[in-house]
Amino acid sequence: MTAGWDVMNKGLSGSCLCEREVADYLAELSVDVLSLVIGVNMVIFFDEEETCKRVEYLLETLKKSRARDIFVIDMFPNKGLIALDQDSAYYRHYRSFKEIVRQTVLKVGDHRFHLVKGEEILKNFTYLSTDLLHPSDNGHIRMGANLADQLTGRGKGVLQHERAI
């Protein structure tokens, strides 16, 4: 089954920090659909205030995009949910960063923006490798299928995700 899309990956694996230059570049792309995963890379570098500024700039800038749909995926479940070290940045920031993304999508107020919860893509911890942060090979496959379901409207999360109005 295919959605009939020509996909171009502009992912910045392990290094995306919602930089202004990246936001400006993505806003200029001639695409029908954008999908973004925001969160985990910034957890160890930034506090909530800086994360909020970066996410706001990214999403406000993407309002200039010609994309008809912009799917914003918040942080995937990871070791931050089960960390015993409550001083760990992953533990402290997991929930607050997800909330920042959610609130910012709503604040943007553009019907093209769709919030997809990370747990709709990474549905359980068996998708992760032993570091409980990065997907395993099988996890990548399952996450890809779940993402395709979300983007094409076949996933149950599409009905449950919050749409900015």
Annotate each predicted stretch with a short phrase.
Residues 1-12, 16, 20-30:
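Serine-esterase "nucleophile elbow" of acetyl-processing enzymes
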